[in-house]
A protein has these predicted regions:
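N-terminal secretory signal peptides and thylakoid transit peptides that target proteins
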Residues: 1-20
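Short, well-ordered coil/turn residues at beta-beta hairpins
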Residues: 12, 137-138, 278-279
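A short, basic/flexible loop-to-alpha-helix module at the beginning of a structural domain
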Residues: 18-31
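Beta1-alpha1 glycine-rich phosphate/pyrophosphate-binding loop at the start
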Residues: 29-102, 186-227
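Short glycine-rich anion-binding loops that position phosphate/pyrophosphate groups of nucleotides
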Residues: 43, 139-142, 281-282
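A Rossmann-like FAD-binding core segment of flavoenzymes
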Residues: 98, 102-111, 115-118, 122, ...
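Glycine-rich dinucleotide-binding loop and its adjacent helix/turn
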Residues: 138-209
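FAD-site-proximal beta/loop scaffold in flavoenzymes
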Residues: 149-176, 270-309
Length: 309
């Protein structure tokens, strides 16, 4: 089995990313290779950190649209009130002060692979970043939703932050006999266990709050549970059997946020108290400039995570 050691990692000098990297051999005249990392989530921040820890004099610049990162991991506990938003809000200060990573807040607009330049839109105008290696870890975007979906009315809460707070407030407003509807996107999507975990946490919340008769309906666009099927099947049919209804093969046909109604290939629901619609997903933002496959994601090497597009 091939061992991808530190030397191999540094040879790729930034080719490891959540989606893609565009490598170029660094000329002998360059003594301090420049790596630009787009996306300050777990993928991008980890790459930036370890390039500085292992890379000697590598210059690393991290680009993100936000001044800090709000973790999707554990955000379901914010929805149920078990954690505060501050507990999942992660700053970039340690990357800067401890690891020497430069940070630029802005939106990556365009990649010039021939010129090794990245255009970033910042509050002060566009900036051009020159690089020897580019790492793209931009997270996800949502595929267009059918019907009239307004996330400010029927939140996805699949990108943590204001959406998490909105869903939390809607859940807190539920009363006896109310219905919480959550959709599971068509695979592949980010964090396969996430929707099922959220359904279980919501069901337990409703139990603990004494919301008699309140239930959770899980509309899964897939033929079956996409992660830990044995555990979640037991959760749905035993632990939370009185509160969770699991519906597979429920491809979403239309969403109407104004009435909190949804039409699927398996069943239709009108006037849910909470409609947590999680759309189908694809590679985020600038990653699409590399070329995506039929599923909407970028093909990468399993050894280096370098793009195959």
């Amino acid at each position: 089995m091939h061992r991808f050691n530190r030397r191999d990692f540094l040879k790729s000098a930034g080719a490891i990313a959540a989606f893609a990297a565009i490598p170029r051999a660094v000329s002998a005249a360059v003594t301090s290779p420049r790596v630009v990392v787009v996306g300050g989530g777990f993928g991008g921040a980890t790459v930036a950190k370890y390039l500085r820890m292992w890379g000697g004099n590598v210059q690393v610049t991290l680009v993100d649209t936000n001044p800090n990162h709000i973790s999707c991991i554990l955000s379901n506990l914010v929805v149920t009130g078990a954690l505060s938003m501050s507990r999942i809000t992660l700053g970039f200060d340690t990357l800067r002060t401890t690891h020497g990573v430069s940070f630029l807040q802005g939106k990556a607009l365009a990649v010039d692979p021939a010129g090794n330049r990245l255009t970033v839109q910042t509050a002060g105008g566009n900036q051009i970043l020159d690089y020897d290696h580019l790492v793209l870890s931009p997270g996800i975007d949502f595929a267009p939703a059918p019907g009239n979906w307004n996330p400010n009315l029927t939140p996805h809460a699949w990108q943590a932050g204001a959406q998490t707070t909105l869903l939390k407030n809607q859940l807190a407003a539920m009363r006896a006999n109310d219905t919480f509807v959550i959709t599971v996107p068509k695979s592949p999507y980010r964090c396969p266990p996430g929707p099922y975990e959220r359904a279980c946490l919501v069901a337990d919340y409703l139990r603990a709050k004494g919301r008699t008769g309140a239930k959770v309906i899980v509309l899964d666009a897939n033929a079956g549970i996409q992660a830990e099927p044995e555990a979640f099947t037991r959760a749905f049919t035993v632990t939370h059997a009185a509160r969770i209804q699991y519906v597979p093969n429920a491809n979403v046909l239309s969403v109407d946020s104004a009435t909190r109604s949804i039409s699927t290939s398996a069943m239709n629901i009108s006037n849910a108290k909470v409609l947590n619609y999680i759309p189908n997903q694809r590679a985020g933002g600038i990653a699409a400039s590399l070329g995506v496959n039929l599923l909407g994601f970028v093909a990468v090497s399993p050894l280096s995570y370098g793009t195959l597009a």
